From Swiss-Prot:
Positions bound to a ubiquinone: 201
Name this polypeptide is given: Cytochrome b
Presence of the UniProt keyword Membrane in the record: yes
One of the record's GO molecular function terms: metal ion binding
Length: 379
């Protein structure tokens, strides 16, 4: 008798994706982040669902409904902070996952990579609209500043901004629609993640060497299920440490002040995971130029497969490319730091230099380094 997991129409799909999936025998812990992202998404949907039961998307009551959740709802405070810090963990896993893909040449799987880029945009949109919901000072002004960027679009800009706002300023209509978007987008992310997996399972996983592993594959279960469990344990432990010991470490104190359209905070800045893009936006003294640079800083990922000039897939055996990759990581960390600083003399010039270096590395230096490595290998 054949096992039910191999014959049942539904269980067969799960079996082929998580049990009998042929997996390279040499993938490292950098391959854990995919499953961790799935775990983060499930946690965010669940905590978000319970928060939505008590939240009111109305300008007069939104802020106090968050206070009510934290003070009066049973374990409301932990649900709220798990959700807020869960977003940070989500982005840590997301950036690690993307970095791994870039380093080991996973962008050779074009479809999987492109769905991944779309997923990144969707997750960023979800996080942005979600940050507006507590209706604190930073929520309100962050929404005002970022949505206002649309006005840089020639001819239709102003109309577009007012259309997004649902009025002449960020108000009740904006908050209500942002709540609607924040509720629906995670389910779109879930659907896209399934498509991402479908495309990945068409080709099979990459591995650190970048060499096809078809002759040495092992079943996903039990080998990688147990390995993913360790990653999940570490993720949950980190999230709980953050939530229980320093829940406001990554938040902004300004968001504990109710939104006031009449008083602007001294430094308007987004959450830490958007600071690198915010620094790129601010480093260009022209509105439209800044918006284009902001968009390109993320969209550039879609062009990575076309910019791959090396004859080797992975960076494992390419020291020049490795060096430039870590320079890129350092550059992004610098941009993240700059994004959180005021627009003053030393920070501005450092931000501009780091922004130029970011595009230079991806568009010029890394492809050229790959060509030099090809020559050295006599390929």
């Amino acid at each position: 008798m054949t096992n039910i997991r191999k014959t049942h129409p539904l269980m067969k799909i799960i079996n082929d994706a998580f049990v009998d999936l042929p997996t390279p025998s040499n993938i490292s812990s950098w391959w854990n982040f995919g499953s961790l992202l799935g775990l983060c998404l499930i946690m965010q949907i669940l905590t978000g669902l319970f928060l939505a039961m008590h939240y009111t998307p109305d300008t007069t009551t939104a802020f106090s409904s968050i206070t009510h959740i934290c003070r009066d709802v049973n374990y409301g405070w932990i649900i709220r902070y798990l959700h807020a810090n869960g977003a940070s963990m989500f982005f840590i896993c997301l950036y690690a996952h993307m970095g791994r893909g870039l380093y080991y040449g996973s962008h050779a799987f074009r479809e999987t990579w492109n769905i991944g880029v779309i997923l990144l945009f969707t997750v960023m949109a979800t996080a942005f609209v979600g940050y507006v919901l507590p209706w604190g000072q930073m929520s309100f002004w962050g929404a005002t500043v970022i949505t206002n960027l649309l006005s840089a679009i020639p001819y239709i800009g102003t109309t577009l901004v007012e259309w997004v706002w649902g009025g002449f300023s960020v108000d009740k209509a904006t908050l209500t629609r942002f709540f609607a978007f924040h509720f629906i987008l995670p389910f779109i992310i879930l659907a896209l993640a399934i498509v991402h997996l479908i495309f990945l399972h068409e080709t099979g996983s990459n591995n650190p060497t970048g060499i096809p592993s078809n002759m040495d594959n092992i079943p996903f279960h039990p080998y990688y299920t147990i390995k993913d469990m360790l990653g999940a344990l570490l993720l949950i432990l980190t999230l709980l440490m953050l939530t229980l010991f320093a829940p406001d470490l990554l938040g902004d104190p300004d968001n504990y002040t109710p939104a006031n359209p009449l008083s602007t905070p001294t430094h308007i800045k987004p959450e830490w995971y958007f600071l690198f893009a915010y620094a790129i936006l601010r480093s260009i003294p022209n509105k439209l130029g800044g918006v284009l640079a902001l968009l390109l800083s993320i969209l550039i990922l879609a062009f990575i497969p076309m910019l791959h000039t090396s004859k080797q897939r992975s960076m494992m055996f390419r020291p020049f490319s490795q060096f430039l990759f870590w320079v890129l990581v350092a550059d992004l960390l610098t941009l993240t730091w700059i994004g959180g600083q005021p627009v003053e003399h030393p920070y501005m010039i450092v931000g501009q230099f780091a922004s130029i270096l970011y595009f230079l590395l991806i568009l010029v230096l890394m492809p050229v380094a790959s060509l030099i490595e090809n020559k050295l290998m006599k390929w």
